[in-house]
């Protein structure tokens, strides 16, 4: 197992694209700090160092928990190659057989990305390097230089037969480079047949080069912070509002997100309903904020669970995560009431939503149908989907949440089960 790995973060002060960008504040901390924190939080490295030409950058590095290495004068110019400063760092820190190069211009490459990439490197030892890549939005076959007269003479592709989706191409995004030290010092690069790709999404791959990139990063980080703070507060406010319901028991218990929480239902087939839905919550949060804290005193004869649509929008979400939290939740239900009959409702399709993809929803439903053995899986597709596989627009007011027609359909399906 390749365990002795050092993280090298290069931070030169004299950037041409955006002056002093590594020290610029991205909302609440310097750009450089995002990469330092991600490296430390990953716990994949024995040491994290910043190689820099700037005492100021060195001070920033130390304040966020990293060591720093001041480059010699000949490596402090924009003419110095990455190979040269990496070689210099490795000549100082000689005890490491492998290293990761983490460029600070990729602030949205987080600890999870690092963990996954390092584990890929550790488990597939026939490869000497792992490089993060992202899908290219322009195929290389249509990228050409202009001639001296700014004409398109080099664009000689037969565009009548061109299909932009015919070839899927990737390019290094600059976020993560991992290599065996000896291999890198010999080849002087990270690429080739002994290198493996670690694929990242477009947003996480943002590489800051100029002012426009930095302004985009500010917008993205503001969105992340706002969503995290507002949603967290709203979820906990709603949990506090439902304390009485958590202390009550009815024959039908509803557990889930807003599709339950927004449903004004008191009885189904004249059977009392205890609606414990929490708007905005996902399966992990419901387990950690409610189930694990044992806020629910007991469960009814029939328990219906609605999760998944808020899971799939979580960064770095995996189907296995949803399955695990569902299983833990159902184990708690059975612990409280061994006689409870548990039903897992399928994730409803959406209509025209940019934040959710029906292909991902269908894939999750198929996975849950095949792997859930701790509850009865109930598919709602036959009543919710239109002929195109979308949520029928007659059942929704925003493409995601149900209107009264949608809730009538849902009530009818549950009524058939509990009759």
From Swiss-Prot:
- What is the pH-activity profile? Optimum pH is 9.0-10.0.
**Cofactors per UniProt?**
Mg(2+); Mn(2+)
Q: Listed GO molecular functions?
A: hydrolase activity, acting on ester bonds; N-acylneuraminate cytidylyltransferase activity
Please give the activity regulation comment for this entry.
Answer: Inhibited by the CTP analogs 5-mercuri-CTP and CTP-2',3'-dialdehyde.
- What reaction gets catalysed by this protein? an N-acylneuraminate + CTP = a CMP-N-acyl-beta-neuraminate + diphosphate
Task: Note the SS bond partners.
Answer: none
The family classification in the record reads:
Belongs to the CMP-NeuNAc synthase family.
What is the protein named? Answer: N-acylneuraminate cytidylyltransferase
Per the record, the gene is neuA
């Amino acid at each position: 197992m390749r365990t002795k790995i050092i993280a090298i973060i290069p931070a030169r002060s004299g950037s041409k694209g955006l002056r002093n960008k590594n020290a610029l504040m991205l909302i609440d901390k310097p750009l450089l700090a995002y990469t330092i924190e991600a490296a430390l939080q990953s716990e994949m490295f024995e040491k994290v160092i910043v190689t820099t030409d700037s005492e100021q950058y060195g001070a920033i590095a130390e304040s966020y928990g990293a060591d720093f290495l001041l480059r010699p004068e000949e490596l402090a110019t924009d003419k110095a190659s990455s190979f040269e400063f990496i070689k210099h760092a490795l000549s100082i820190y000689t005890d490491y057989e492998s290293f990761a190069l983490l460029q600070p211009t990729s602030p949205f490459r987080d600890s999870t990305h690092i963990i996954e990439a390092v584990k890929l490197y550790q488990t597939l030892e026939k490869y000497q390097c792992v490089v993060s890549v992202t899908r290219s939005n322009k195929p290389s076959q249509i990228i050409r230089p202009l001639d001296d007269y700014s004409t398109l003479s080099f664009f000689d592709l037969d565009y009548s037969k061109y299909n932009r989706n015919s070839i899927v191409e990737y390019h290094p995004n600059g976020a993560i480079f991992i290599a065996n030290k000896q291999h890198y010092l010999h080849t002087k690069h990270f690429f080739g047949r002994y290198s493996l790709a670690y694929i990242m999404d477009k947003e996480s791959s943002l590489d800051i080069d100029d002012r426009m990139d930095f302004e985009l990063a500010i917008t993205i980080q503001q969105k992340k912070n706002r969503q995290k703070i507002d949603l967290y507060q709203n979820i906990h406010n709603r949990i506090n509002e439902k304390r009485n319901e958590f202390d009550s028991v009815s024959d039908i218990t509803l557990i889930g997100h807003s599709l339950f929480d927004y449903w004004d239902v008191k009885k189904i087939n004249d059977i009392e309903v205890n609606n414990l839905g929490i708007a905005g919550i996902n399966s992990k949060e419901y387990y950690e904020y409610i189930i694990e804290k044992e806020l629910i005193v007991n469960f009814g004869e029939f328990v219906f669970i609605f999760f998944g649509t808020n899971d799939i929008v979580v960064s770095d979400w995996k189907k296995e995560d949803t399955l695990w939290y569902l299983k833990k939740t159902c184990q708690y239900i059975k612990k409280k009431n061994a006689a409870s009959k548990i039903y897992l409702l399928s994730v409803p399709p959406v209509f025209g939503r940019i934040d959710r993809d029906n292909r991902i929803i269908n894939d999750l439903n198929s996975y849950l149908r095949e792997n859930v053995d701790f509850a009865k899986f109930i598919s709602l597709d036959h009543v919710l989907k239109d002929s195109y596989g979308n949520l029928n627009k007659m059942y929704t007011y925003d493409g995601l949440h149900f209107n009264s027609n949608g809730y009538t359909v849902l009530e009818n399906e549950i009524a058939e089960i509990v009759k």
